[in-house]
Amino acid sequence: MGSATGHAMTSHESRSGNRGILHLFAAATGWFAVAAWGAEPQVTEGFVNAPVAEVWRIFTTSEGFLATGAAQAEVRLAIGGEIRSHYNPQGKLGDAETIVNEILAYEPERMLTIRIKQAPASFPHRDAVAGTWTVLYFNPAGENMTHVRIVGLGYNDSPASQAMRKFFAEGNRWTLDHIAKPYWPKCKLCEKESG
């Protein structure tokens, strides 16, 4: 095999050259992966003192979804199905303030993947929604306890995307805490202090 300088490459030079090309390719591929993925995922985790089946029901049924803090909800669990929710009790499902999440994938009682199909008209980060999606993982964590991991993906480094990421970091934390609260254990001291 010849080189650009016209001299024959030794076997060692050939291997080194190939390694250099591989390193360059790996670096370029790594850069592309970072550019394609953008910012780090937004991750929120928590535990709910309830079996996985119960926590799954909360996220995947119309009645259960009310436990997330929604005033109204309609869930159709299917690929391409929707989770429609409204957080204003005076609002109406289907109006401009309805949140519509499309179900992209699911594995019963293990994983649910959604994307925002329609953000509320008043949502300040509407322009940053495109290209984002969320994966929710449900894992047993001992007897009658579920570990929930919410991973928001598709964010980029733009100010609008980062503002939306912060919004969902706070909102997802609130939602998980809200879901978990009714299941918190009530020890005798806790009951005495709260009563």
Residue locations for each model-derived region?
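A short, structured loop/turn motif at beta-sheet edges
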Residues: 49-53, 77, 104-112, 137-147
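Amphipathic alpha-helical segments
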Residues: 49-68
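Beta-strand/loop substructures that line and gate deep hydrophobic ligand-binding cavities in soluble
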Residues: 122-170
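Short beta-edge strand/loop motif at the mouth of beta-sheet-based domains
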Residues: 63-98
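Bacterial N-terminal signal peptides that target proteins for export
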Residues: 10-25
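Bacterial N-terminal signal peptides
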Residues: 23-35
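Short, highly charged C-terminal tails/helix-capping segments
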Residues: 153, 181-195
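Hydrophobic/aromatic beta-strand elements that line small-molecule binding cavities or substrate pockets
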Residues: 44-46, 72, 98-105, 131-140
